[in-house]
């Protein structure tokens, strides 16, 4: 499992620890990833995702998983999020076909 947010795409960065004597040693800056369960109203199911705290805030700010994914262009979404978006669109099309 990669250390990458499935919504924002944030990943590991590298840099230096710098001591008081200005000695530098390499280090990694890890994203604050949380295993979260988001509920999709359209799918009628919960979706487990590994998101950064910034990604969780972004989804909540946009009104939930469904509205965030449907309102975001595919070029801005990582592949994992695009897969969930396609599932949501398929279910929406089926529901629209049943009502028509």
UniProtKB/Swiss-Prot annotation:
> Which Gene3D superfamilies does its entry note?
Ribosomal protein L28/L24 (2.30.170.40)
Provide the alphabetized UniProt keywords: Ribonucleoprotein, Ribosomal protein
Any single Pfam family the record assigns to this protein: Ribosomal_L28
Q: What's a Gene Ontology MF term here?
A: structural constituent of ribosome
The UniProt entry's sequence similarity note says: Belongs to the bacterial ribosomal protein bL28 family.
* HAMAP family associated with the record: Ribosomal_bL28
Question: What's the protein called, per UniProt?
Answer: Large ribosomal subunit protein bL28
Chain's gene name:
rpmB
